[in-house]
C-alpha cells in the first residue's frame, strides 16, 4: 500500500513569494529531457517547483525518503506517479510494479516507454529529494530512463547535490535545464516581498537588501529572521548578522535558541515527537503526541511558520521541511531519549491501524521492540514477501532474537524462503535443520510439512531429484488441504521429479494439477512454471503441436498477469525457439532466442547460455559456419565461467559436436570425448541428449561399434519411456552411423522409421542438420517413388531446406563447375558437342536434388511451361528419356568430378 502523501505535490501557500524570474525560465521545461534544481537545504527548491506545477494536470510528483533506496519501493512509487500524471494510462506497468513482475528497473522502464508511446501530450515527472538515493542500481536505471524517455516527457529532479544521472552528456547535447543555488537565492526585490508578507510592520527596502546580502539570499535564513522578528526576541538585522556566513550544517544552535526556546513546552514536545514521522496526518499525530485534535494542531504549527508544509490538496498530510525535520529528530534523541521507544511504538501502531505495515516495521525497528516487530511480521510478512519487500523482511528478521523465531516457526520458514529466493540453498537446509533440532515437536504436523515442501524445492533446484521426491511426498502426506501454497510447491516438485525420471504421463498430470491449483489461488509464477513443464513434456512425447498450444496458453498468461519480466519468460521463449527450429522456421526461432536474451539482459551473462546455444543451432541449420564459430567462442567462454545444470551442458555440447562434425574437427571431438560426463542413466531428454552427443563424436572418430551400442540402448530407453522426440533424433543419428559404415540397407531402414515418426513430431531441421549424406539418401528414396504421401512430401521439404541453406548439389552446376566439366578428359562426347545452356545445367542440378517441375519453376521464378521446355531440351542433349535417367547421368558426372555421391 502506497502512502498518498509521497505522491502529492506540495500545496502552494498563500504567503510565499512567487519567483517570477525562475518560473519564466521553467516555462520552457518541456523542451528539455531533464530539469535539474540543485542547492543545499532551504533554498526553496520544492516551493519553486510547486509554484511552477500549479495548474498543470499532466504531472506526477514523487517525494523520496531514505526507504526509497529499495528498488521495488522506488519502482512502485515512480510508476504510481506516472499513473497520476497520465490518469492511469500505463496499466500494464502499474500491475507489473505492484506484483513485482519485472526483471529489473530498466526492463520495467522499457515497458513504461512502450505504453507512453501512445501518450502524445506533454508530460512531467517530478522527483523531490533525489539526494537521498544512494543505491547505484537506481542511479543506473535513472540514467537509462533519461536516455530513452519519450520526447514529450520532461523529468524534473530536485536534489541537494549533483545527481549521478549523466548530467555532462545532457548538458553538451542541450537537453538539460539547470537552476542552482545562485539562481535560487533571493534577490533584493524578492526579499522585500517576503518580509512584507511575513511581518506586520514593514521594513525599509535598504534594510531588507542588507539582510538579504548578509545571508546571501538563503530562503531558510530569511524565514528564521521573520520568525524571530515576530517573536520580538531580536531585531531582524541582528538575526541576519547572526545567520550570516553559516549554512545548513551549523544551524542547530541557532534553531534551538531562536525556535525551540521561544515556544511553550507543549509545542516544543509536539514538535519533537511529531518529527519522528516522515509524513503525518491527524490520526498519526493524535496517537504519537497525545494531542486530541491532531489536524488542528498541525494547522496551528503551520500558521506559526514552523517549517511545516502540506503534502496534498486535501490538507490531510503534512511533513516538516527536511532541514527542520532532521534537526528536530536529532533534538528528540537528546531531549526525549527515554520516551523515544514508546513514541516509535505509538507511531507503529498508528501506521498499522491505517494499513501501512512497512512503515510500521520502520518504527518497530527504531523502537527496538522485538515483540511488536514479531507481531507485525506474523500478520503481514507473507504479504510483504509476495510483494518482494525482501530487503525490509531480511532486516526485520535479523532484528529478532533466535528464540523469537523458534517460538514462531512461520518466521523461520519465511527466513528460509528468503534464502531460497536468493539461491542460498545450503543455508536453507542448515537453518531448517537447526530449527527442527531446537523446536519441540516440530518434526510432526503442518509446519514440518511446510519445511519439507521448501526443502523439496531446494533439492530439485540443486539437482537432487531423489531427495526432492522423498520430501515432496512427505509434505503432501502431512499438509492439510487448506495449505495451498506449500501444496502447490510440493506438487510442482513431484511433477518435475517424474519428468526427470522419464515418467512423462504421470508428470504431465501433476503439472496440470499444479496449474489448476496455482490459477485458483493466484500463484501466477507457479502457474507459468507448470505450463512450461507441460510443454516440455509434450515435446518429449513427440506431441509438438500440443506443446505449441500449451505454450500459447503460457504466453496468454504472461500477457494477462504481466509476467514479461520474470526470468521464466526466457524459459518459455527458449522452448518456443526449439520448437520453431524443429519445424525449420529458423528466422522465427532466432528471433525468439534473441528475445530470451533480452529478457535476461540484466542478469549474469551465464544465464544466456541456453539461448546462445539456440542461436548457434540456427546458424548450423543454415550452414553458416562462420557465424556459428563466432558464437561458439562466446559459448565456450561462458561454459568455462559458470556452473550449469546437466540440461544446459547437454544443449551446449550438442552444438559444439555438430559444428565439429560439419568441419571435420576430429581433434576437438576426441579431446571432448575424453573429458565429458558420461551419465549413469538415459531416462530423460537431457540425459538422452548428452549420450547422443557422445555417439555423434564417436561416429565422427570412426568408432562405429561404440556409437551403435550407445544408440541402441538410447532407443530401447526412449521406446520404453515413450520419449518419441528423442527416438526420432536417435534414429537420424543411427542412420548416419550406418551410412558412414557402408551399411546402406540398415541406413535406409532407420531413415524410413525416422520419416514416419516425423509425421508425429513434425521434425525438419533435425534431418537438415545432417547435410549432404541425408540429401543423397532422400534423393534416392524420392527416385524410388515408394514413399507414402506424407513421407514423400516431408522428404522433398527437407531436400529444399538442405539445398537452400547448404547449396549442396545446386552449387555444383554453377559456371565454374561447368567450365571444369567441359574441359575434363572423360567428359561424354555428347555433352561436349551439344552443350547445355547455363539455365539447363541449373535445371539438371535441381532435378538431381529431388525438385518437382513446379518446385523448379518456383526456385528459378519462371513459368512451369518454360521449365518443361528446358527439361525436354536437356533430355535430348543428354540422350535420356526420363527423370530417373537424368538423375543417374548427373550422378555419374559428379563422381567423375570427384564428388562423393
Swiss-Prot record:
Residues 853-872 bind DNA. It comes from the Bacteria. GO terms for biological process: positive regulation of carbohydrate metabolic process; positive regulation of DNA-templated transcription. Activated by ATP and maltotriose, which are both required for DNA binding. Residues 829-894 form the HTH luxR-type domain. Keywords: Activator, ATP-binding, Carbohydrate metabolism, DNA-binding, Nucleotide-binding, Transcription, Transcription regulation. ATP binds at residues 39-46. GO terms for molecular function: ATP binding; DNA binding; DNA-binding transcription factor activity. Pfam families: GerE (PF00196), TPR_MalT (PF17874). Gene3D superfamilies: P-loop containing nucleotide triphosphate hydrolases (3.40.50.300), Tetratricopeptide repeat domain (1.25.40.10), Winged helix-like DNA-binding domain superfamily/Winged helix DNA-binding domain (1.10.10.10). Belongs to the MalT family. NCBIfam families: PRK04841.1. Monomer in solution. Oligomerizes to an active state in the presence of the positive effectors ATP and maltotriose. Positively regulates the transcription of the maltose regulon whose gene products are responsible for uptake and catabolism of malto-oligosaccharides. Specifically binds to the promoter region of its target genes, recognizing a short DNA motif called the MalT box. This is HTH-type transcriptional regulator MalT. It comes from Escherichia coli O1:K1 / APEC.
